[in-house]
Amino acid sequence: MTTVDGDTIYEYDPLDRLIKTTTPDGESTSMTYDGVGNITSSTDANGNTTQYKYDGVGNVVETIDALGTSAFFEYDSMGNLVKTRLHRVDTQDNVDEWEVTLYEFDGRGLTTKQVDALGNVTTYAYDGNGNLVSKTDPDGYTTEYTYNALDLVTKINYNDAKEVSYRYNKTGDLISMTNWLGTTTFELDLLHQL
């Protein structure tokens, strides 16, 4: 089956899975699937193919890009990503493990800590609704987030004392944003579109 959205062409297999997208300028991307519907490969407009491998519950456990770089993903029993490892294979088939990232989660499955290959730690804190309320980067800079009753962010405070605030109408549409450079106002039509 083939459908057209504007000038972009979408092609589907008999199981209604997207297998090819062609843009108006003729660039195409394509995908292949396994028997349970997982994407096994994707090819971009430049012909670069990435392969995907899965565990028994459908989590991506490995990707291999066109340059031979492999990424491995490990999950906890709740399905949360807890570790990534990147490996590169050189022209002599030597494997170089060059980046490992570790993740920690709270009981709700929200990321609370990320440790990169150099030991740099980023921490995250959340409110009772699961909204991110603070993020502290490896340099100790903290960004804080404030939300309204609809769980929409109303203010972001950056470590350097800069602040961004957001205003919404009664239906939750963003109507203005104010930062250290000034205020931007958004006008919406009856369909709530800019």
Specify the residue positions occupied by each region the protein language model found.
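Beta-strand elements of repeat-based all-beta scaffolds
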Residues: 1-23, 27-44, 48-65, 69-116, ...
